[in-house]
């Protein structure tokens, strides 16, 4: 897969209350172009927003790309690079035999990541990393904007609990 566009993506999720109003922030960089995306939900969790951010970022890419995706979420990074293989083998159950939380988003992230060559990177949050700080601001602003959009996956997950 050579000759692919090289894209840098930075993502973050935020939740006020956890669960509570939440949002995600994304910074995409291609050559000298930068695009920012953010959205909020009325009731969700921090982990769901940390997962939704890379999903949305990867879904906006129109063609397969070589991606460096940087996040401050160990949950997302370890999940997609390590844990997901066992979950899929076990029918989306954890090593303890429990249903994987946020399975709707894990499945989406798994599917959309198949289109791209991705280098999943972690950066310490709130440590002065320019793009991560910008994503954090975007995510927090989206959560604070009194979003009315429903996170149907979270609502369905709560109904089944």
UniProtKB/Swiss-Prot annotation:
Signal peptide: none annotated. Monomer. Keywords: Cytoplasm, Endonuclease, Hydrolase, Magnesium, Metal-binding, Nuclease. Residues 150-161 have a biased composition (Polar residues). PANTHER family: RIBONUCLEASE H1. Binds 1 Mg(2+) ion per subunit. May bind a second metal ion at a regulatory site, or after substrate binding. Its EC number is 3.1.26.4. GO terms for biological process: DNA replication, removal of RNA primer. This is Ribonuclease H. Its cofactor is Mg(2+). Mg(2+) 2 binds at residues 12, 136. Its main location: cytoplasm. One of its GO terms (molecular function) is magnesium ion binding. InterPro entries: RNase_H, RNaseH-like_sf, RNaseH_domain, RNaseH_sf, RNaseHI. Residues 133-161 are annotated as: Disordered. It catalyses: Endonucleolytic cleavage to 5'-phosphomonoester. The lineage of its organism: Bacteria, Pseudomonadati, Pseudomonadota, Gammaproteobacteria, Alteromonadales. Belongs to the RNase H family.
């Amino acid at each position: 897969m050579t000759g692919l566009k090289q894209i840098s993506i930075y993502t973050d999720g935020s939740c006020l209350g956890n669960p509570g109003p939440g949002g995600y922030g994304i910074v995409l960089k291609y050559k000298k172009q930068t695009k920012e995306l953010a959205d909020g939900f009325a009731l969700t969790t921090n982990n769901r927003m940390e997962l939704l951010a890379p999903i949305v970022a990867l879904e906006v890419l129109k063609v397969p790309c070589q991606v460096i995706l940087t996040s401050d979420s160990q949950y997302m990074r370890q999940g997609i690079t390590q844990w997901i293989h066992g979950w899929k083998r076990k029918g989306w159950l954890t090593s303890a035999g429990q249903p994987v939380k946020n399975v709707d988003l894990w499945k989406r992230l798994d599917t959309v990541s198949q289109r791209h060559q991705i280098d999943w990177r972690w950066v310490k949050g709130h440590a002065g990393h320019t793009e991560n700080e910008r994503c954090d601001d975007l995510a927090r602003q989206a959560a604070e904007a009194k979003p009315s959009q429903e996170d149907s996956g979270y609502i369905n997950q709560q109904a089944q609990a």
